[in-house]
């Protein structure tokens, strides 16, 4: 039987600093999504979540609202409260789904084209995508897809994910299945 907590731990917390990397801010984008079973004001929920996540990224903000397949979105550079004054937030309307994004750019440039969520029209419908992180093979994947005739509107790796989902959607019965297949 252990006599103290120290007997149970491989290292005491004070010893961990010797083996862990130095602590420093490692920001990434902030992403939020909400689903409501009935049509309601989902945009303000996304707004407040993005406001809380704003420390994650302060280059730009965007919200897309889905009301039974009809998308309303706004995206721009700036802080959340600058991008979404009350009237603009109201203009997003109501819906059952909202996705929001605040950007901390790690790939692509910091221009308006790269503001997320990305809105995509494809053969089987429409989607809004917000992504946090980096694809480790984004450069090679973009080159491969462009050599096959793909055209991209942004310089972010997030658009590669949207493209992969749209391609899988051609073969899959549902968007959920397409997402799973695209991310394998």
Stretches with model-predicted labels:
Residues 2-184:
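Conserved short alpha-helical segments that host acidic/polar catalytic motifs at enzyme active sites
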């Amino acid at each position: 039987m252990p006599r103290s907590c120290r007997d149970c731990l491989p290292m005491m917390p004070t010893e961990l600093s010797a083996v862990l990397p130095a602590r420093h801010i490692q920001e990434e984008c902030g992403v939020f999504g909400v689903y409501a079973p009935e049509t309601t004001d989902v945009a303000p929920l996304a707004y407040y979540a993005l406001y809380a996540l704003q420390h994650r990224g302060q280059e730009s903000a965007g919200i897309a609202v889905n009301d039974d397949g009809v998308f309303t979105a706004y995206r721009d550079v700036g802080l959340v409260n600058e991008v979404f004054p009350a009237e603009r937030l109201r203009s997003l309307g109501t819906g059952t789904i909202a996705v929001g994004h605040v950007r901390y750019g790690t790939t692509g440039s910091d221009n308006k084209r790269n503001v997320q969520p990305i809105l995509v029209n494809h053969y089987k419908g429409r989607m809004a995508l917000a992504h946090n992180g980096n694809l480790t093979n984004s450069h090679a994947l973009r080159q491969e897809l462009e050599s096959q005739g793909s055209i991209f509107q942004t310089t972010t790796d997030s658009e590669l994910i949207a493209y992969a989902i749209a391609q899988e959607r051609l073969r899959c019965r549902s968007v959920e299945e397409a997402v799973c297949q695209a991310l394998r």
